[in-house]
């Protein structure tokens, strides 16, 4: 299961959806696409406004500068991940700390 912790300015993502075999998992692909697209958009707007870390265990996205457009993109990312969790509750769990 993918476990996502969401707070006001930070998102942490861990795990694997286990929806299908590695390389064929549409839920993992959806999470990856949503996160990569959103982070790239935020970095394009203000490369110093977001901290993005992707290591073997966790993906972490944190808003570090107050920027209206970055905040909108970040909030959109949170909503997309919550929607995916609603659609695939056995594979994605969102814990909100807001």
Predicted regions and their residues:
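N-terminal intrinsically disordered, cationic/polar leader segments
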Residues: 1-26, 33-36, 40-98
């Amino acid at each position: 299961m993918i476990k996502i912790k969401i707070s006001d300015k930070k998102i942490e993502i861990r795990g694997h959806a286990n929806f299908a075999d590695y390389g064929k998992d549409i839920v993992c692909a959806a999470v990856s696409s949503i996160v990569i697209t959103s982070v790239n958009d935020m970095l394009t707007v203000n490369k110093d406004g977001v901290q993005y870390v992707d290591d073997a265990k966790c993906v972490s996205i944190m808003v570090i500068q107050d920027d209206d457009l970055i905040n909108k993109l970040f909030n959109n990312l949170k909503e997309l991940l919550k929607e995916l969790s609603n659609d695939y509750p056995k594979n994605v769990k969102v814990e909100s700390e807001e």
